[in-house]
């Protein structure tokens, strides 16, 4: 599992930052990539990475402001042009389907794959398979805005090889089935329950994505004990009143959530163009006074999300 920042600017691009997009790479787990918001020129940013558009199977849109969605039509078109793209699901507030369909219709663009739309209305579960679950909750912005919590389901414990050796389980399919927690039958007819040969179950990883919002209780619920919290940091701490007036957050707001909700790592994104160079690093330094495991995200930064313990 890996997270990569394709755009980290707020409102409009700057010379060093594109507008919002974060990629969650689940290649080892699902052979998929999920995108969170698709700002203008996201497809150009992708060209600078190893992400293949056909691997993108799910797109989560926080809200319908232009700096978070203007890259969608172009990306969808290019994904079709490159071929081999399977079905795609877009999760977002009301209006996202109309925006996409109107853009494609006016530009006479035809995509070669089905697109499913899931309209975000209420807090709760919006996706689940055998490995992951995704939850959403309403944030506090000028338009309907949602945060996301991606939860990896618990992983089976390690295979207890010393115990396996006692029963002379041969290498091959039987050992693999045992590792998967299944019951196997040995050549002498003896049955072994795989669950008895596994160590303690390991907790899965949790990734929380919070874009445009001012502080609200739901952020804490989504961020609780997350391994990674990606949080908007449009302004520094001195601009708190202005930030909240415009329905945004400061680097200190993000740091307090990370500290109070026992997050492992905080990444600051959605940075105002006023914070360039040293001013940008000051956001990081300021936040670290509250939560030391803070990092200012830059475009194309990529980080592995490791398992706990």
Swiss-Prot record:
InterPro entries: Metallo-B-lactamas (IPR001279), RibonucZ/Hydroxyglut_hydro (IPR036866), RNase_Z/BN (IPR013471). Gene3D superfamilies: Ribonuclease Z/Hydroxyacylglutathione hydrolase-like. It catalyses: Endonucleolytic cleavage of RNA, removing extra 3' nucleotides from tRNA precursor, generating 3' termini of tRNAs. A 3'-hydroxy group is left at the tRNA terminus and a 5'-phosphoryl group is left at the trailer molecule. Disulfide bonds: none annotated. Its cofactor is Zn(2+). Its EC number is 3.1.26.11. Keywords: Endonuclease, Hydrolase, Metal-binding, Nuclease, tRNA processing, Zinc. CDD domains: RNaseZ_ZiPD-like_MBL-fold. Zn(2+) 1 binds at residues 63, 65, 141, 212. Zn(2+) 2 binds at residues 67-68, 212, 270. The keyword Hydrolase applies. Pfam families: Lactamase_B (PF00753). It is an enzyme of class 3 (hydrolase). GO terms for molecular function: 3'-tRNA processing endoribonuclease activity; zinc ion binding. The active site is at 67 (proton acceptor). SUPFAM superfamilies: Metallo-hydrolase/oxidoreductase. Binds 2 Zn(2+) ions. Belongs to the RNase Z family. Homodimer. Zinc phosphodiesterase, which displays some tRNA 3'-processing endonuclease activity. Probably involved in tRNA maturation, by removing a 3'-trailer from precursor tRNA. NCBIfam families: PRK00055.1-3 (NF000801), RNase_Z (TIGR02651). This is Ribonuclease Z. The gene is rnz.
């Amino acid at each position: 599992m890996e997270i990569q920042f394709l755009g980290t600017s707020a409102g409009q691009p700057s010379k060093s930052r594109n507008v919002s997009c974060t990629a969650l790479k689940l290649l080892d787990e699902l052979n998929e990539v999920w995108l969170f918001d698709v700002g203008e020129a996201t497809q150009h940013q992708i060209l600078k990475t190893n992400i293949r558009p056909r691997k993108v199977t799910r797109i989560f849109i926080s809200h319908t402001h232009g700096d978070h969605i203007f890259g969608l039509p172009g990306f969808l078109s290019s994904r079709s042009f490159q071929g081999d793209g399977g079905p795609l699901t877009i999760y977002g507030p009301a209006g996202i389907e109309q925006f996409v369909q109107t853009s494609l219709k006016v530009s006479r663009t035809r995509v070669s794959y089905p697109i499913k739309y899931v309209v975000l209305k209420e807090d709760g579960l919006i996706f689940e398979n055998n490995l992951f679950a995704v939850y959403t909750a309403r944030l506090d912005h000028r338009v309907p805005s949602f945060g996301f919590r991606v939860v990896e389901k618990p992983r089976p414990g390690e295979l207890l090889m010393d115990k396996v050796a006692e029963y002379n389980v041969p290498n091959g399919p039987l050992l693999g089935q045992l590792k998967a927690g299944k019951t196997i039958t040995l050549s002498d007819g003896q049955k072994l329950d795989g669950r008895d040969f596994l160590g303690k179950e390991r907790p899965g990883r949790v990734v929380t994505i919070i874009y445009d919002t001012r502080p609200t209780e739901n952020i804490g619920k989504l961020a609780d004990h997350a391994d990674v919290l990606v949080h908007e940091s449009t302004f520094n701490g001195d601009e708190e009143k202005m930030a909240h007036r415009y329905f945004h957050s400061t680097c200190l707001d993000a740091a307090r959530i990370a500290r109070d909700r026992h997050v492992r790592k905080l990444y600051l994104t959605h940075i105002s163009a006023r914070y360039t160079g040293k001013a940008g690093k000051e956001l990081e330094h300021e936040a670290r006074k509250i939560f030391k495991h803070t990092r200012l995200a830059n475009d194309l930064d990529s980080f592995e999300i490791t398992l706990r313990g």
